[in-house]
Amino acid sequence: MRLNNIKKAFLASAALLSAMSMSAAERFVSFKQGDLLINGNDKVEIYMDANDCRGVSYAANALVRDISKVSGSQATITSNQKATILVGTIGHSAAIDQLIKQKRINGNLLKGKREKFIITVVDNQLVIAGSDRRGTIYGIYELSQQMGVSPWYDWADVPVEHHDSIFVNRGTYSDGEPAVRYRGIFLNDEAPCLTSWVKNTYGTEYGDHRFYQRVFELVLRLRGNMMWPAMWGWAFYADDAENEKTADEMGVVMSTSHHEPMARNHQEYARNRKGWGPWNYQKNKANLQKFFREGIERMKGTEQIVTIGMRGDGDEAMSEEADTRLMTNIINDQRKIIADVTGKKASETPQVWALYKEVQDYYDKGMKVPDDVTLLLCDDNWGNVRRVPNAQERKHKGGWGLYYHVDYVGAPRNSKMLNVTPVQNPWEQLTLAYENGIDRLWILNVGDLKPMEYPISQFMDMAWNPRKYDVNSITRHTRDWCAQQFGESQADEAARILNLVCKYNGRCTPEMLDKNTYSLENGEWQEVVNQYLQLEADALRQYNSLPAAYHDAYRQIILFPIEMMSNLHQMYFAQAQNNALYKQGNPKANVWADECERLFKRDSIICDYYNHKMSGGKWNGMMTQKHIGYKSWNDAFEKDTCPELFRISASETPVIAEHNGVVEIEAPFFASKTDAAPQGKEKEGAKWVQIPFMGKSLAGMTLMPYTKGVKGASITYQFKMNALARNAASSNNADSKKVRIHVIIKSTLDYQNKGGMTYGVSVDGAEPILVNFNHNLNEKPENIYDIYYPTVATRIIDKVIEVELPATGDGIHTLTLTPNDPAIIFEKIVIDGRGGKGRVKII
């Protein structure tokens, strides 16, 4: 964000603005004094050209409501060009075009730009001008945000603080163009929560235009511009013809999911399988071509992105007979239909081909794709980028996209109930993607939309300007976002709590949590429970300190997910205690059984409050997801069930020291580190950075930027292990001189497809031992169940090596790690001198 051509009058108010939540260079709205009072006489007139885009009208009317929320002033849309506020799009607003012609505003800032706005004061009029319709819309919503209206005012009930006066300061304000061209969300896995809420709210069995209008407004307020609509049981295009019209009018680019080609929803086929015939292009080409043609005919004249290609029926893999030749024929035929229906070259209609699961194999095997088609890469459903385009592939004219998940249905187990994505993970992986040329389209699977408020905002903000966020500023984003929702005075504490709940929840999803997740023996279970209890207490303390108007928003965004996961951890901890004590014949097992049952009931009480009491029952049905009782990957069980219980009848350079034969070293507690040497024409190599909150324990250490070489880099740790204690711990076995070293790192995939990534481990200056940690971390049949699923679900790779530990006089040793590839994130090192006995602590 920047202010250009600042006038003297604006400088006079800089001292005032610097005390506000955003820097003086970022803000143009004030509530105490400024150059232009926009709500004088309690009336605000907003002018827009009647010939301007329909989406600008939607946003202008939203601004009318926002001004009323903030100040109580009466705002109206007027035909008076001397109105207090002028909004318009170049080429669609005569007033804006005239100001450019008169050089009252700099047209060069907008002409030829994409989705860019400028906000400036001309004489005594606030002017919001856009390079195109969405540029104008974003400018309008920028004013709303600076007035204090959160994009989440509706979807998270964030209150709007009252101000009697709204001032703006002279200058020209803009936030440039978006880095990623298409930025959107995918409503997915929407049953039972979103579907129940929609039925309770609108009385429909599907999402109609009333529902989608609210979603579209949120997307635009967040500076998104596209959507994949919900598609499990809904058909966006067929259920309500107003859906498509509303999207196009408001300025949202519609598309369909990775397995719904040619602007058709899967349900349009599924509801009439008998009529359409098998979803098999080899056997049913004519009918499927007709199905595809109808989709293109229906979307003609609207701004959409056409998904091309095919997957199997219902998001399954295609038949074994499918091959690259067949897929090539399908895409060629689809493009012929697009050209025929639109009367334009196929290349003039935006298209995307999703390289999802087995479809990526077709591309990797050399399938040729038209140069104008955007190639959509996908994460592994757990937030790990599978691959990035190489230097040659980045020349692809259609560009590259990314399909990213914070919600997932599938093996090893669903992840639907809560946001379990640590704040730092999307930032790190989206940075990886963007730095490797993935910048045409980003789409985020958000499940039911709620409770994914923060990851949606984070994703959209990064898509607009990923270079704004680095290792030093990612936590600042969380803080500023919390200031927007809960006020400046609450931002630091709210951000700390939000960071921690996302971090904690990322350790294990509620669906995968059970009595065996952590160890009772080494105290890990108790430690995790204590962390949640402390966090819950901190959140409740802040909740109670807030004005009542903020309670519902705070509960939705922060308190509810903490209460849910704290309670679930306590419940499974109680079950683990019950089961262990029962085996010992200890009657205290009954006490823990009672506690587990109490906590199971409390789970439903927490959800009931969310559904029926919070926000006056506004969110009835939104928290009805089953999450206790999983036996396999899916929630194919009738209702939540209490865990199995048993009862007994009534008849500093730091030197890390060992503890009980084990040394635990957090990655940031290094003795020394060496950055990478410059490679080729580089002025400097990659540097070690600490990623706060990254991983399962304290933080992560890695080399950045990822695009620079890592040769010559190393990081060294010191530890002290008493040889006698070690020998005693191992009972003088044959392995008494050996220790097991666990190097715990983030579960990064082999995104360069080079046969695995490696690092070296050296003890006391010995020759490094080379460790290839992810050569088999893939979905090949021989790896998927035993290696891939367990690893990505826990988000770490724990590689163990055995080394001979030489005797030293003081017991102090060094351990040096030398990464040989970028994007290796070290989280923790554990040296186990107990002869392989016992489980080491990961957290």
Residue spans of the language-model regions?
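The substrate-binding groove and active-site-proximal loops of carbohydrate-active enzymes
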Residues: 127-130, 191-208, 225-234, 272-287, ...
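C-terminal non-catalytic alpha-helical accessory regions
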Residues: 158-163, 476-629, 704, 713-715
